[in-house]
From Swiss-Prot:
Glycosylation, residue list: N24, N38, N54, N97, N181, N301, N499
Protein known as: Hemagglutinin
Family: Belongs to the influenza viruses hemagglutinin family.
Primary subcellular site in the record, as a coarse category: virion
Lipid tethering residues (S-palmitoyl cysteine): C555, C562, C565
Membrane topology recorded in Swiss-Prot or TrEMBL: Single-pass type I membrane protein
Segments in the Extracellular topological domain: 17-530
Keywords from the UniProt entry: Clathrin- and caveolin-independent endocytosis of virus by host, Clathrin-mediated endocytosis of virus by host, Disulfide bond, Fusion of virus membrane with host endosomal membrane, Fusion of virus membrane with host membrane, Glycoprotein, Hemagglutinin, Host cell membrane, Host membrane, Host-virus interaction, Lipoprotein, Membrane, Palmitate, Signal, Transmembrane, Transmembrane helix, Viral attachment to host cell, Viral envelope protein, Viral penetration into host cytoplasm, Virion, Virus endocytosis by host, Virus entry into host cell
Gene transcribed to yield this protein: HA
Signal sequence annotation: 1-16
Other remarks in the entry: Major glycoprotein, comprises over 80% of the envelope proteins present in virus particle. The extent of infection into host organism is determined by HA. Influenza viruses bud from the apical surface of polarized epithelial cells (e.g. bronchial epithelial cells) into lumen of lungs and are therefore usually pneumotropic. The reason is that HA is cleaved by tryptase clara which is restricted to lungs. However, HAs of H5 and H7 pantropic avian viruses subtypes can be cleaved by furin and subtilisin-type enzymes, allowing the virus to grow in other organs than lungs.
Record-annotated membrane-spanning stretches: 531-551
Complex formation: Homotrimer of disulfide-linked HA1-HA2.
Cellular location(s): Virion membrane; Host apical cell membrane
Amino acid sequence: MKTIIALSHIFCLVLGQYLPGNDNSTATLCLGHHAVPNGTLVKTITNDQIEVTNATELVQSSSTGKICNNPHRILDGIDCTLIDALLGDPHCDGFQNETWDLFVERSKAFSNCYPYDVPDYASLRSLVASSGTLEFITEGFTWTGVTQNGGSNACKRGPGSGFFSRLNWLTKSESTYPVLNVTMPNNDNFDKLYIWGVHHPSTNQEQTSLYVQASGRVTVSTRRSQQTIIPNIGSRPWVRGLSSRISIYWTIVKPGDVLVINSNGNLIAPRGYFKMRTGKSSIMRSDAPIDTCISECITPNGSIPNDKPFQNVNKITYGACPKYVKQNTLKLATGMRNVPEKQTRGLFGAIAGFIENGWEGMIDGWYGFRHQNSEGTGQAADLKSTQAAIDQINGKLNRVIEKTNEKFHQIEKEFSEVEGRIQDLEKYVEDTKIDLWSYNAELLVALENQHTIDLTDSEMNKLFEKTRRQLRENAEDMGNGCFKIYHKCDNACIESIRNGTYDHDVYRDEALNNRFQIKGVELKSGYKDWILWISFAISCFLLCVVLLGFIMWACQRGNIRCNICI
């Protein structure tokens, strides 16, 4: 009879009709964490691809396609380069005394005056761009014995001949060109930028017809520097009907210093000075349209948001911009490790804890409880552990941005042909910096992701251990993130476990009694040995029946002949 009872008990267990803990005297409580059907793969220090519930993209890979005019003051060069505006090309007169944070040069810009070159073009362009102003002050230079205000048909201002408005072309007066020696002190408390030039005629005849002397000379000095230029007479490629050229030079005069100009011909004299300012203004080549909008970061492709720490839109930037990296994507984990919920668990879909899988549909928290008791099933989030994890993760993105955003601009680098080796070195340095930052960015994100996953796992374990300490011997760890509670635990009891007010002493006697009864069937009542012996006997009996049946079948077919001898 005891054997029959034991077999009946086992049969009920298999079919799930009588599960210890599923009756009114027991309950099951599982701890779990949030999960989503399709997570996001991120990289950590220990794993190239690990799935998390949520992640934030850190690389800005696209621009708005337009340059925002706020908060930076943008000056659109339109048809003018910065140097043409500086010299006073007639079609750039509208830029006189302009100011800017960023001067935007267009690919369609052109010169429309006397052909010129600037031996140190990049330095002059960068100097004026960083000053952020074309403020010009006219000074009373005295040029005695020469003709002033020379002009050319190649540089029309209105219907007649013209010239650069910031320069004064000096030629012979009657048949003489005396030696010029002019000084101009700087009695102000700021630097002054003087632009001057040297005319290179195309022929000797042009040289003498303009300056009398067969060869001129221009010397410009300060206490700190001196430049002497000898004109190079000779024909050059024709530009706007001219084969002669003007070379543009510049001199900075510090406060208390003196500008000295000495020449016996070929001088393109300054009319005054540009007031130099220090600042973070800059210049950028771009064909992106300028629009009314707000953006702190500008690239030649257009403005980009600076709410991400990295960007791969363009190396050239202006403003507070994300750091340029080579990667197209870097994802920062802002959620926990994702273990999608299994669709079926066991014969009747019993609940399971975090060790087996996560829980989908937990919209009110990252961590929580599920239970089965005499009143049914239920689920609730644990807001305290959820908030503890969120508080530590929320600041991650801002901290990464603070570490990486540049509060300065990366200007364009230009070099003349004779500075080719310097240009190559500069390119190598910039490429090395980008490689280094790209590596640092990947490492930084991997470290942060590792910390996030470890942190969220730790919060889950803390909640589990807290629950274990409350239940003590009143429940058994089922090994999958669940506890089998060996006493009647209604919804109020479950709530007390969740909020930390559970008193295990109240249920201790009931739990011990139920534990003994349930475990007795399994281990203490002798049923285990009976079950083993009965299973062995039945197996042997079935084996004998099968063997005997085979022998009888073989005898009937004549495959086996049995002789009985007496």
